[in-house]
Regions:
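Conserved, structured core segments of small domains
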Residues: 1-123
């Protein structure tokens, strides 16, 4: 089963400490080597590059960041191929433990979502 983990936090924290980047890189290396992590990526703050395209009352609007009204913004993601939801939660907990250890005072969350299996298009 494929799962996506989505890390969210307040935008005002700035960039993570280098020690956290290093620890996340090591965790990612291990998960990639054992075949459980398929993809991962971090996102720049919305004040650097952030745009929202929205439909509201049938109208499309485009808004440039930063998004002052947002309580949390997505900071990154990972896609895993795992056997169960429990394994996905374990991966998220390990990731959050690194934040707790290397970025004291940071507050945020990691959301775990199972991905849909989409059938291939028919010819």
């Amino acid at each position: 089963m494929k799962f996506m983990t989505i890390v969210k936090g307040k935008e005002g924290y700035g960039f993570p400490p280098q020690e956290l980047f290093d620890a996340i890189a090591e965790l990612g290396k291990e998960a990639t080597e054992d075949g459980t992590m398929l993809s991962t990526g971090g996102l720049l703050p919305t004040k650097i590059v952030g745009v929202r395209v929205r439909i509201d009352n049938g109208e499309i609007t485009v808004t440039d960041g930063p998004f002052a009204e947002a309580k949390e913004v997505v900071g990154g993601f990972a896609i895993f191929d795992l056997k169960s939801k429990e394994e996905a939660v374990e991966a998220a907990v390990r990731f959050m433990e690194l934040h707790k250890k290397y970025w004291p005072g940071w507050e945020g969350e990691t959301e775990v979502r199972q991905m849909m299996d989409v059938p291939p298009p028919t010819a």
